[in-house]
Every structure is written in structure tokens, then in C-alpha cells.
């Protein structure tokens, strides 16, 4: 299945039903009074996080979603039925933005999490609502308001504990194949990995973590070179980054310069992402003698100004891989999972919808001193049904 991590959709909430103007008609009750019911509220539009989905490809073809309109009010004080809500399923890890304002509406980070993205219109009021001591036969009603319309930008950001960085052919896909059951494509040419992939590393029956493999970066990626940096967003929720360095590049390039390119592109993309905890990992050490590999790794770390330990592995032979994974697992215990999913993200403020306060103000605008509101008809009164608050 094609991996799609961005989609633009239109959501339209249902309109509110109109209020009804009706009077009680019953034998032996000549003046039954008003009995017009209210309309029903329009249906809302929700997003629902589903862990069984892993791409937004469905929304490249179906781009418009509409909730049901509320029914109109009826006589005998019958309220119209509320419009049915519309629920849109998205993968866990989806960030929702208003495409027009750029406002972040929410992050779908838990299975079955629900988020309202468009609020249905408020119901209209029937003429029963307007009866009073001076107006016992009102002919006023209100119309239902329009449902809210939003254009949304959906951005899928993978939820992983560990993210891998490196130049093309640094051995990232080989590493994820060695530590998990994931089987990304591995070949001897650059950009074998074209889309992100996830692998679950199980240390024992109770301990595990998730690793994300993204396409390699090259110099100028922040300006669109290669596959660009569009996949770096998938590392924003990771707790730790693994910087894989090919200790003996086949193309003869300088490992120090390659490492600096990755760090530079990371900083240009996001300062917060560049400040995440990182582990320096030298891969393909099996191509050199053990002592030569250790000396070269130490020299590269010194030139980079790296402070702290580094790791020497051979992903294809699984040499040193187990020790690296256990060290990562121990680090995971010091970094709570909920922090990793909110770090670098601002908690979205409460989303304001169009009709949140409409019902509070609607009746306050009614003036009872107007001559049109009494029971007696005179030349100053209008004939027929009066519709008020139409928007």
C-alpha cells in the first residue's frame, strides 16, 4: 500500500433544523395556544484515531465529508430529530490543522481518541418559546443556523520511541531488519528506502520499543535535495535519535563531513529536534580490523567534538547490536512515554466553534416592548409568520 502522510479534506457539519409555527387544534379548545416545536441540532464532524490504519491514502480520493442536517420542528411541541454525526477514521499519530488559519486543532495520539473538528448548527426555536403574558399567540420562530465548514490539513507523524538518522546507505534499514521483524528493502544503491517504516524491538516478554527508519539525508536536503526533509517530521515524537555513521564509506567520502551534514540539516529543520538526545553509532565495523575500527571511530568522534560514549556495530552480522538495544531500553525507562509524545509540541488551546454561544444570546435579543408582540392585531402589526434571527 502506498504511504501517504499528508491529506487535505473538507468537513461540513449539518445545519440546524428550523423552528415550527403551529397552534393547538383540538375540539372544544378554541384557543389552544402555540405548540410549535424546536428544530434539531445539526450533526457534528469528528475524527477518530484507529491503530489499524497506517496511511492517509484514503483521503486522497475522498476529500469531502458532511454531517446530517437536523430535522425541522413539528406541531404538538415535537422537537426535530438531531442530525447524525459523521466520524472520520485517521491513523494514530495524525496532527490536525485548520488549512486556512494554520490553527492546530489537536493531535490524535491514542487509539479511539475522538476530536470534534466541525460543530453542527444550532436548532431553530418554535413559536412556543416566544409565548408570554402579553403575547399568547406568537407567530415568531427562528431558523436553524448553518453548520460549520472547515478545510483541514491532516499530517501523519509516526509514533516511535527511537528514530534513525544517517546518509543514504549508512545501514539504517539493515539495522532495523536485524533488531525487529520489519523487512524494509535493502540494496547497494542510495535511497533504497523511499518511505518511513517502523519496527518493534522486543527485548523480552515485557520490554520493547519502536524504531522508525526514514529515508537518508544528503547535503542540501533542507532546500529540497534528494528526498528533502519532509520525512523528518516523523522523528518529532521520538525519545532518542540514533545517528548511524558508515565508518568505511564505499564511495570514499569523509565520515566526519557526512556526520556534520546530518547535524546541519537537522538544525535547519528544527532546533527542538536537533536538541533531542542522540546516540552516535558507527556501522560496518566488520570491514576493518577491530583495533583499526576502534581508532577510526575515536578519531571521528574527536573531530565531531562528541562527548560521551559511542557504539560500534555491524548490523549485517548483528555484532554489538544487542548491547546497543539494551542500552536504549534502559534509557527508555528514564524517559516516560507521555513526554515523548508531547515534547516539542504545544498543547492546542480549546477550539472555538461558530455556534458555541449562539443559544445564550438568541433570546436576549428579543424586545418585549415592541407592539408586534401583543395579542391584539392593529394597523402597525405585520401579517403572517415572522422569521427572526436568520443568518
Curated annotation (Swiss-Prot):
Residues given in the record as GTP binding sites: 166-173, 191-195, 213-216, 283-286, 314-316
Residues that bind Mg(2+): 173, 193
CDD domains: Obg
Domain OBG-type G: 160-333
Domain of life according to the entry: Bacteria
Keyword hit for Hydrolase: yes
Domain Obg: 1-159
Localization of this protein: Cytoplasm
Keyword GTP-binding on entry: yes
One Gene Ontology molecular-function label: magnesium ion binding
Self-association and partners: Monomer.
Function: An essential GTPase which binds GTP, GDP and possibly (p)ppGpp with moderate affinity, with high nucleotide exchange rates and a fairly low GTP hydrolysis rate. Plays a role in control of the cell cycle, stress response, ribosome biogenesis and in those bacteria that undergo differentiation, in morphogenesis control.
Protein's name in the database: GTPase Obg
Gene: obg
Amino acid at each position: 500500500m502506498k504511504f501517504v502522510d499528508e491529506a487535505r479534506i473538507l468537513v461540513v457539519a449539518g445545519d440546524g433544523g428550523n423552528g415550527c409555527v403551529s397552534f393547538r387544534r383540538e375540539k372544544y379548545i378554541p384557543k389552544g395556544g402555540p405548540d410549535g416545536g424546536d428544530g434539531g441540532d445539526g450533526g457534528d464532524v469528528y475524527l477518530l484515531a484507529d491503530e489499524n490504519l497506517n496511511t492517509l491514502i484514503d483521503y486522497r480520493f475522498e476529500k469531502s465529508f458532511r454531517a446530517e442536517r437536523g430535522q425541522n420542528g413539528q406541531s404538538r411541541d415535537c422537537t426535530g430529530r438531531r442530525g447524525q454525526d459523521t466520524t472520520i477514521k485517521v491513523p494514530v499519530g495524525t496532527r490536525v490543522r485548520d488549512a486556512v488559519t494554520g490553527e492546530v486543532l489537536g493531535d490524535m495520539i491514542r487509539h479511539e481518541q475522538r476530536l470534534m473538528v466541525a460543530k453542527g448548527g444550532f436548532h431553530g426555536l418554535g413559536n412556543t418559546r416566544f409565548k408570554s403574558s402579553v403575547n399568547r399567540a406568537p407567530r415568531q420562530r427562528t431558523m436553524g443556523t448553518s453548520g460549520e465548514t472547515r478545510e483541514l490539513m491532516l499530517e501523519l507523524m509516526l509514533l516511535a520511541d527511537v528514530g534513525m538518522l544517517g546518509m543514504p546507505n549508512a545501514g539504517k534499514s539493515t539495522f532495523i531488519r536485524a533488531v525487529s521483524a520489519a523487512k524494509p528493502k535493502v540494496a547497494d544503491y542510495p535511497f533504497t528506502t523511499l518511505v518511513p517504516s517502523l519496527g518493534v524491538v522486543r527485548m523480552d516478554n515485557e520490554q520493547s520499543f519502536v524504531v522508525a527508519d526514514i529515508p537518508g539525508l544528503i547535503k542540501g536536503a533542507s532546500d529540497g535535495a534528494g528526498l528533502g526533509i519532509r520525512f523528518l517530521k516523523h522523528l518529532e515524537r521520538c525519545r532518542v535519535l540514533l545517528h548511524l555513521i558508515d565508518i568505511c564509506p564505499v564511495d570514499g567520502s569523509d565520515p566526519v563531513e557526512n556526520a556534520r551534514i546530518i547535524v546541519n540539516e537537522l538544525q535547519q529543520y528544527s532546533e527542538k529536534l536537533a536538541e533531542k538526545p542522540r546516540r552516535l553509532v558507527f556501522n560496518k565495523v566488520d570491514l576493518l580490523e577491530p583495533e583499526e575500527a576502534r581508532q577510526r571511530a575515536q578519531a571521528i568522534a574527536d573531530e565531531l567534538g562528541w562527548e560521551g560514549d559511542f557504539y560500534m556495530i555491524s548490523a549485517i552480522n548483528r555484532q554489538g547490536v544487542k548491547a546497543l538495544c539494551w542500552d536504549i531500553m534502559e534509557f527508555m525507562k528514564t524517559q516516560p512515554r507521555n513526554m515523548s509524545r508531547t515534547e516539542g509540541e504545544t498543547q492546542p488551546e480549546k477550539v472555538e466553534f461558530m455556534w458555541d454561544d449562539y443559544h445564550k444570546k438568541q433570546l436576549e435579543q428579543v424586545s418585549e416592548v415592541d407592539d408586534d408582540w401583543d395579542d391584539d392585531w392593529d394597523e402597525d402589526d405585520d401579517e403572517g409568520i415572522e422569521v427572526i434571527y436568520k443568518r
